[in-house]
Swiss-Prot record:
Function comment: Binds to muscle nicotinic acetylcholine receptor (nAChR) and inhibit acetylcholine from binding to the receptor, thereby impairing neuromuscular transmission.
Cysteine pairs bridged by disulfides in the record: 24-45, 38-62, 64-75, 76-81
GO CC aspect terms: extracellular region
Entry's family note: Belongs to the three-finger toxin family. Short-chain subfamily. Type I alpha-neurotoxin sub-subfamily.
Name by which UniProt lists this protein: Three-finger toxin W-IV
InterPro entries: Snake_3FTx (IPR003571), Snake_toxin-like_sf (IPR045860), Snake_toxin_con_site (IPR018354), Toxin_cobra-type (IPR054131)
Pfam families: Toxin_cobra-type (PF21947)
Species in which this protein is naturally found: Walterinnesia aegyptia (Desert black snake)
Length: 83
């Protein structure tokens, strides 16, 4: 718990030092929630979901990628909007 709190504080400080940058969740469905500051003036976060034989996979990150047919994509423009 302390590690997670420290990580969030560090990410917040880094984001504030760089000016207003977008903060997005960046984990896959099988991992614990994490966030990242988007670089290069990126202005969108995404959540991508697709079915597999073992269940639905969810991937999150910065940007708004092009996806193949059958993959659900949600792009958004506010901090941590891709949960």
């Amino acid at each position: 718990m302390k590690t997670l709190l420290l990580t969030l504080v560090v990410v917040t400080i880094v984001c504030l030092d760089l000016g207003h940058t977008l903060l997005c969740h960046n984990q896959q469905s099988s991992t614990s929630p994490t966030t990242t500051c988007c670089s290069g003036g990126e202005s969108k976060c995404y959540k991508k979901r697709w079915p597999t034989h073992r269940g639905t996979i969810t991937e999150r990150g910065c940007g708004c990628p092009t996806v193949k047919k059958g993959i659900e994509l949600h792009c958004c423009t506010t901090d941590q909007c891709n949960l």
